Design a protein with these regions (language model features):
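A Lys-centered signature of the CheY-like receiver
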Residues: 112
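Two-component/phosphorelay signaling modules centered on CheY-like receiver
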Residues: 25-44
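Non-catalytic signal-transmission and effector/linker regions of two-component phosphorelay proteins
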Residues: 1-17, 115-128
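Conserved acidic carboxylate
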Residues: 22
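Active-site residues of response regulator receiver
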Residues: 67
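Acidic, metal-coordinating helix/loop segments flanking the phosphotransfer/catalytic sites
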Residues: 45-63
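Acidic catalytic/metal-coordinating carboxylates
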Residues: 48, 74-77
């Protein structure tokens, strides 16, 4: 029996390589699954700062979805590294916008719990 393929319109992130950096296992899996359903090639989840940096340096990435607090360490270095490579980032966080450094204030921010449709739309807006 042949598997049915979803059309590109049903998979709006088709072909995009999205890095997910999230230290909460359940949130990470939920995000990754939703992004795959939308057609993204998911890199990660990276669960800490070092794994996120390694992925940025090793992988071809179109967009990064970053939790701000990774096991007590702030992920702003990841956003800066992505920006240096001209790759858009999106913060998925419980932190208020006032916690984000001024030089990263223009990075899109979604509040947790992240609405997965809003996440998909933010990635579309940043990358397409």
């Amino acid at each position: 029996m042949a598997m049915m393929q979803r059309s590109v319109s049903e998979r709006p992130l088709h072909g995009l390589r999205v890095l997910v950096v999230e230290d909460d296992y359940f949130i990470a899996i939920e995000m990754c699954n939703a992004l795959r359903e939308a057609g993204a090639d998911v890199i990660g989840p990276a669960r800490d700062l070092e794994a996120g940096l390694a992925a940025i340096r090793r992988e071809q990435i179109d967009c990064g979805v970053l939790d701000i607090n990774l096991r007590g360490r702030m992920a702003f270095q990841l956003a800066t590294e992505l920006r240096a490579r001209k790759i858009p980032a999106i913060f998925a966080t419980g932190y208020d916008a006032s916690m984000i450094p001024a030089e990263l204030a223009d990075v899109a921010r979604l509040e947790k719990p992240v609405d997965l449709v809003a996440l998909r739309r933010a990635i579309e807006a940043a990358c397409l």
